[in-house]
Amino acid sequence: MLRRVTLKETWEVAKNIKAFRFDEKLDFTPGQFIMVWLPGVNEKPFSLADKDLIVVKRVGPFTSKLFTLEEGDYLWIRGPYGNGFKEVKGKVALVAGGIGIPPIYALAKHGKLEEKVLIYGARGKDELALLDIENYVDEIVITTDDGSYGIKGFPTDVLAKRKEEFSQVYACGPEIMLAKVLEIMNYERTQISAERYMKCGIGICGSCALGPYLVCRDGPVFTGEQLKDTEFGKFTRLPDGRIKGLR
């Protein structure tokens, strides 16, 4: 059921990326999402970065409208929905690419993991968000495509060199990056936060189909084994149902 929340604060965390904190603390598992409704605009899913926080990149009409909201304005939300990350013992890698950082941030902050290594990449220094995540991990490795901060390259470059260290890899980011993570790990010891176009968020409409799964109901977090024989990393579906290749 939709419920109204009030924005307590909003702030810019990186280039074209904004944080929105609201006045309700949600009981959630890192990796779960909420549906956010703006009257007269649309409704969209966002992974929770914290109990009362979403972090959003401006990419279209909905997020552009969201960016105009300020402290004291209202949002309408429902959820949390979906299946989140399952915690595994040992040293783990948290791999984030671009705006894939929010659920990884939530896992770093709230997960009771033994040893956490964050591998986080963005196009450039100005697109790195939520860097206070360093307070919740044991090691942080930053990569940028242009070399403006940290190591020049991609998170998967780092993972490929260190994959044997980790009992589990948790990842969220662009699908091409996630497909590479699965390839590096041979679809083993991985939990991936997947994205598909989503309408209902509760497993009714089928818009977010991914192989035999519905992302909203069965995900958004999947194991590598679940994704191995699906189209993940090969093609996705547009809002009108058309297939779009990813490579």
From Swiss-Prot:
The keyword Transit peptide does not apply. One of its GO terms (biological process) is 'de novo' UMP biosynthetic process. Pathway: Pyrimidine metabolism; UMP biosynthesis via de novo pathway; orotate from (S)-dihydroorotate (NAD(+) route): step 1/1. One of its GO terms (molecular function) is electron transfer activity. Its cofactor is [2Fe-2S] cluster; FAD. NCBIfam families: PRK00054.1-1 (NF000796). Heterotetramer of 2 PyrK and 2 PyrD type B subunits. Belongs to the PyrK family. This is Probable dihydroorotate dehydrogenase B (NAD(+)), electron transfer subunit. It comes from Pyrococcus horikoshii (strain ATCC 700860 / DSM 12428 / JCM 9974 / NBRC 100139 / OT-3). The lineage of its organism: Archaea, Methanobacteriati, Methanobacteriota, Thermococci, Thermococcales. The gene is pyrK.
